[in-house]
């Protein structure tokens, strides 16, 4: 096993740990989930570049008769990238005392101001940071509003 294979295993393990945390652990942290809303994805250009570069590496490894283990590890890395960037849906998860946004826990008392932009983006102003929440379904903004009023 080469150093390249070890690095690939490390990256695959990191992506797998992130996927498991995002899918199974985070919804169970900090109490029961009150509301979980699907968000719009960010630009997919970065993901296409990543998966494309890994596909080029797979092609290069196969045509130069590289190690079969490296080809399998690159394929697993491409599949993990495809899952994280294309299949997994980003979500905002509301709990009793706060919410998870982009895998970060934010308590409700940190919200200083909330606005709704003309294009349906909920803007939450924290102490030193501004969150731009783009929901997939515009009707979910009303659910978020009702939940935040209920918890304030």
Curated annotation (Swiss-Prot):
Gene Ontology cellular component terms for the protein in this record: plasma membrane
Statement: the UniProt record of this protein carries the keyword Transmembrane helix: yes
Compartment list: Cell inner membrane
Keyword Cytoplasm: no
InterPro entries: DUF986 (IPR009328)
Transmembrane segments: 6-26, 45-65, 67-87
Superkingdom of the source species: Bacteria
Pfam families with a match to the protein in the record: DUF986
Keywords from the named record: Cell inner membrane, Cell membrane, Membrane, Transmembrane, Transmembrane helix
Topological type in the membrane: Multi-pass membrane protein
Protein family (similarity comment): Belongs to the UPF0266 family.
This protein's name: UPF0266 membrane protein YobD
Source species: Salmonella arizonae (strain ATCC BAA-731 / CDC346-86 / RSK2980)
Gene for this chain: yobD
């Amino acid at each position: 096993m080469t150093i390249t294979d070890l690095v690939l295993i490390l990256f695959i393990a990191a992506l797998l740990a992130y996927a498991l945390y995002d899918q199974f652990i985070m919804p169970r942290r900090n109490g029961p989930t009150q509301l979980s809303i699907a968000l719009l994805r960010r630009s997919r250009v970065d993901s296409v570049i990543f998966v494309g570069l890994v596909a080029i590496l797979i092609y290069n490894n196969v045509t130069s008769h590289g190690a079969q283990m490296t080809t399998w590890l690159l394929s697993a890395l491409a599949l993990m990238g495809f899952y994280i960037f294309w299949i997994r849906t980003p979500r905002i998860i509301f709990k009793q005392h706060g919410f998870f946004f982009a895998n970060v826990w934010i308590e409700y008392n940190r919200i200083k101001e909330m606005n709704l932009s003309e294009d349906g983006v909920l803007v939450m102003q924290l102490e030193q940071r501004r969150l731009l929440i783009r929901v997939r379904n515009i009707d979910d903004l009303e659910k978020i509003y009702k939940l935040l009023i209920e918890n304030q």
